[in-house]
Amino acid sequence: MVPVSDGSVWGEHVRVIGFDHLVLNVEDVERALGFYCGPLGLEPVRVDEWRAGKAPFPSVRVSPDTIIDLVQRDRGESNVDHFCLVVEPLDWQQVVDAGGFTVVDGPGRRFGARGHAESLYVLDPDGNTVELRWYPPEA
């Protein structure tokens, strides 16, 4: 258990080993792609699949292990949907049962910077959504 300054205690902890992706809510996905792939020179990911209706959103690659997902949302919503941290392999059910996190979705298989993997969505103390994901060794 990890004590925090407000006197509460967090349960079992996970070991974060990297940053996987950030999900940006954008008004116009094509305009956002033009900006991130144009002046910033980032590599497009799954754009053809998205345009063909086979992927729910496109991404841009920041590094071999990090992407930014571009999701169309109305401007009244937050600009950041969630961010994803890579953690060491773990037993998801043990993490859920330990009660240290407010789980909002998962575990489930989802797309990330290195392909599909198991992940879990949790809330931080301020209500921000954090995705925790681990990749199999071959990813």
PLM features per residue range, with description:
Residues P64-I67, G76-E77, P89-Q93:
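Short, charged/polar surface micro-motifs in flexible loops or helix N-caps
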Residues I17, V23-I67:
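Core segments of cupin and vicinal oxygen chelate
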Residues R51-P56, E77-N79, A113-E118:
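Short acidic/glycine-enriched loop/turn segments that link adjacent beta-strands
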